[in-house]
């Protein structure tokens, strides 16, 4: 098989490999402004599949979709200076319209907590019904210093959910529930194993009491924060003077959550699963699950007829497919299919037609299968399930083999130098985290829960102070 010439190998230059894959596989083109991209049809279809799956869960949870303004007024910003401080370097500000200066600045949303707080205040004053559970699919803008397509864009697509509750416990538990769903979604649909936990004080979302995160390992052993859920407490409710009447008709301040995932998951799919030939899609999220390649169909119409037969079977089985009926050479068609990442390709030529036979090739390991067309539906479903399971297993092994426990700062520094995920007993200050980042480039990804799939000891000695602690923190270099 001829290797695509335009894709750099992962070992030679991982960053270049990533860009080569997403461009050659037609996921995106660079936009005219730094940090923006044109989503091409294949790239946007991945997002549509994500939206479809996640929305189905939201419906079950009675979370309703809304759409809120892109623009935030200055007085909202003044109310939440602490929250906005975290976004200040990235905040896009409108100061002028035409040739006229605005009396007050207008801000383009980096996130929508302020708008949802304002909305909740009006709705509760009107109806006094809690909880309210909402979500919006939208775009936000953040003027990032360093950009990377899908992983860190100036403008990106996401879902941001917001809820408001009468009870502190109910709100916090709901944030945790959403974080568990994100873990389930990444592992069961994207075949990406994750480490879940709570962010440290330094790393948590600005304005949150607690932030719950799911962290994934890329093939270059960097961490990617893949989704987060925040328990906001009463922080926004107090500043926006949100009140509800309890059963005793007394005014109480409610509790909020916010949570989201974004198009950076497209980058995660690429970085976790793909190879030097191009994309590899997990079947459950793949825009095209089966690529049907016609060979010599211009000279042999029976090949076209056979391809349509296959397509009909796949359509009835609700398996997404595409037919390549171009007159390109065989090698080109195979390479093109490899680059674009369909989990399965079916190669059809005169011999397959003559023998009423299917030639099926797995994208992930290039294993070939030959069988009668009557077995297509059964075989396809079984092989797609196996690919999904194998991709997850491969990524899980990578995660486990490259995550280490350390008990001293020397062990810590060596492990980070070796590009490992590092779990360490740690009960230090945010300033100490800053020191670690400056010295090693690693950040605290999350505090591991006691029920983590890692066998955590009951306690350990914090790697800096030596004090006894039952807190174990995951550190890694990250995107």
Curated annotation (Swiss-Prot):
<dbReference type="InterPro" id="IPR002316">
    <property type="entry name" value="Pro-tRNA-ligase_IIa"/>
</dbReference>
<dbReference type="Pfam" id="PF03129">
    <property type="entry name" value="HGTP_anticodon"/>
</dbReference>
<comment type="similarity">
    <text>Belongs to the class-II aminoacyl-tRNA synthetase family. ProS type 3 subfamily.</text>
</comment>
<dbReference type="InterPro" id="IPR004154">
    <property type="entry name" value="Anticodon-bd"/>
</dbReference>
<keyword id="KW-0648">Protein biosynthesis</keyword>
<dbReference type="InterPro" id="IPR004499">
    <property type="entry name" value="Pro-tRNA-ligase_IIa_arc-type"/>
</dbReference>
<keyword id="KW-0547">Nucleotide-binding</keyword>
<dbReference type="InterPro" id="IPR016061">
    <property type="entry name" value="Pro-tRNA_ligase_II_C"/>
</dbReference>
<dbReference type="GO" id="GO:0005737">
    <property type="term" value="C:cytoplasm"/>
</dbReference>
<dbReference type="GO" id="GO:0005524">
    <property type="term" value="F:ATP binding"/>
</dbReference>
<comment type="function">
    <text>Catalyzes the attachment of proline to tRNA(Pro) in a two-step reaction: proline is first activated by ATP to form Pro-AMP and then transferred to the acceptor end of tRNA(Pro).</text>
</comment>
<dbReference type="GO" id="GO:0004827">
    <property type="term" value="F:proline-tRNA ligase activity"/>
</dbReference>
<comment type="subunit">
    <text>Homodimer.</text>
</comment>
<dbReference type="GO" id="GO:0006433">
    <property type="term" value="P:prolyl-tRNA aminoacylation"/>
</dbReference>
<dbReference type="InterPro" id="IPR036621">
    <property type="entry name" value="Anticodon-bd_dom_sf"/>
</dbReference>
<keyword id="KW-0067">ATP-binding</keyword>
<protein>
    <recommendedName>
        <fullName>Proline--tRNA ligase</fullName>
        <ecNumber>6.1.1.15</ecNumber>
    </recommendedName>
</protein>
<dbReference type="GO" id="GO:0017101">
    <property type="term" value="C:aminoacyl-tRNA synthetase multienzyme complex"/>
</dbReference>
<keyword id="KW-0436">Ligase</keyword>
<dbReference type="InterPro" id="IPR033721">
    <property type="entry name" value="ProRS_core_arch_euk"/>
</dbReference>
<dbReference type="InterPro" id="IPR017449">
    <property type="entry name" value="Pro-tRNA_synth_II"/>
</dbReference>
<dbReference type="Pfam" id="PF09180">
    <property type="entry name" value="ProRS-C_1"/>
</dbReference>
<dbReference type="InterPro" id="IPR006195">
    <property type="entry name" value="aa-tRNA-synth_II"/>
</dbReference>
<keyword id="KW-0963">Cytoplasm</keyword>
<dbReference type="InterPro" id="IPR045864">
    <property type="entry name" value="aa-tRNA-synth_II/BPL/LPL"/>
</dbReference>
<keyword id="KW-0030">Aminoacyl-tRNA synthetase</keyword>
<dbReference type="Pfam" id="PF00587">
    <property type="entry name" value="tRNA-synt_2b"/>
</dbReference>
<dbReference type="InterPro" id="IPR002314">
    <property type="entry name" value="aa-tRNA-synt_IIb"/>
</dbReference>
């Amino acid at each position: 098989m001829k290797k695509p010439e335009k894709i750099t190998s992962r070992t030679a230059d991982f960053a270049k490999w990533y860009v080569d894959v997403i461009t050659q596989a037609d996921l995106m083109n660079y936009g005219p402004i730094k940090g923006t991209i044109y989503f091409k049809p294949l790239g946007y279809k991945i997002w549509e599949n994500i939206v479809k799956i996640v929305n189905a869960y939201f419906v079950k949870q009675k979370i309703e979709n809304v759409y809120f303004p892109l623009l935030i007024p200055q007085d909202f910003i003044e109310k939440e200076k602490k929250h906005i401080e975290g976004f200040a370097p990235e905040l896009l500000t409108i100061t002028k319209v035409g040739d006229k200066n605005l009396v007050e600045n207008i801000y383009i949303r980096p996130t929508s907590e302020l708008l949802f707080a304002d909305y909740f205040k009006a709705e509760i004053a009107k109806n006094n019904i809690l909880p309210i559970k909402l979500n919006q699919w939208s775009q936000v803008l953040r003027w990032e210093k360093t950009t990377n397509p899908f992983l860190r864009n100036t403008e990106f697509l996401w879902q941001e959910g917001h809820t408001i509750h009468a009870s502190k416990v109910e709100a916090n538990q709901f944030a945790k529930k959403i974080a568990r769903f994100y873990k389930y979604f990444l592992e069961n649909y994207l075949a990406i194993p994750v480490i879940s936990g709570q962010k440290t004080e330094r790393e948590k979302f600005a304005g949150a009491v607690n932030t719950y995160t799911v962290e994934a390992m890329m093939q270059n052993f960097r961490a990617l924060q893949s989704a987060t859920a925040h328990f906001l407490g009463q922080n926004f409710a107090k500043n926006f003077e949100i009140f509800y009447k309890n059963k005793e008709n007394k005014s109480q301040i409610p509790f909020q959550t916010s949570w989201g995932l974004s198009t950076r998951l497209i980058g995660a799919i690429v970085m976790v699963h793909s190879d030097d030939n191009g994309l590899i899609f997990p079947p459950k999220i793949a825009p095209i699950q089966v690529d049907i390649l016609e060979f010599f169909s211009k000279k042999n119409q029976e090949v076209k007829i056979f391809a349509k037969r296959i397509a009909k079977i796949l359509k009835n089985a609700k398996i997404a497919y595409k037919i390549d009926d171009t007159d390109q050479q065989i090698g080109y068609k195979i390479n093109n299919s490899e680059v674009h990442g369909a989990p399965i390709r079916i190669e059809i030529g005169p011999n397959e037609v003559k023998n009423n036979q299917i030639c099926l090739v797995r994208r992930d390991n290039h294993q070939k299968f030959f069988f009668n067309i009557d077995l297509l539906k059964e075989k396809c479903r079984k092989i797609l399930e196996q690919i999904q399971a194998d991709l997850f297993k491969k990524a899980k092994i990578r995660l486990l083999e490259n995550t280490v426990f350390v008990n001293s700062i020397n062990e810590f520094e060596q492990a980070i130098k070796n590009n490992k995920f590092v779990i360490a007993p740690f009960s230090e200050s945010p300033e100490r985290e800053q020191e670690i980042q400056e010295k090693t480039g690693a950040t605290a990804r999350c505090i591991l829960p006691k029920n983590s799939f890692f066998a955590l000891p009951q306690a350990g000695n914090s790697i800096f102070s030596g004090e006894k602690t039952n807190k174990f923190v995951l550190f890694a270099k990250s995107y």
